[in-house]
Amino acid sequence: MSNKGQLLQDPFLNALRKEHVPVSIYLVNGIKLQGNIESFDQYVVLLRNTVTQMVYKHAISTVVPARAVNFRVDDSAEG
């Protein structure tokens, strides 16, 4: 994934992680996972509920926070 693709993704996921916002993650096959984002990198998200699951980003369709989240995007980095 290009750096440009990370401009929205990283600040959004980081805000969810820092604020301990519960999320529902829908996979491309329709499965719904719920928990808190513990960590993430370019390829995976660690989702914590009763256990920690490693979810590959290419399998994720949608991330739905349980509440609104404020996050900043660095506009100067856009091309």
From Swiss-Prot:
Domain Sm, residue spans: 10-69
Gene Ontology molecular-function annotations: RNA binding
CDD domains, A to Z: Hfq (cd01716)
GO CC aspect terms: cytosol
HAMAP family: Hfq
PANTHER family in the cross-refs: RNA-BINDING PROTEIN HFQ (PTHR34772:SF1)
Species of origin: Cupriavidus pinatubonensis (strain JMP 134 / LMG 1197) (Cupriavidus necator (strain JMP 134))
Subunit structure: Homohexamer.
Function: RNA chaperone that binds small regulatory RNA (sRNAs) and mRNAs to facilitate mRNA translational regulation in response to envelope stress, environmental stress and changes in metabolite concentrations. Also binds with high specificity to tRNAs.
Gene symbol of the encoding locus: hfq
UniProt protein name: RNA-binding protein Hfq
Biological processes per GO annotation: regulation of DNA-templated transcription; regulation of RNA stability; regulation of translation, ncRNA-mediated
Chain segments annotated as coiled-coil in the UniProt record: none
InterPro entries in the record: Hfq, LSM_dom_sf, Sm
Keyword Protein biosynthesis: no
PROSITE patterns, per the entry: SM (PS52002)
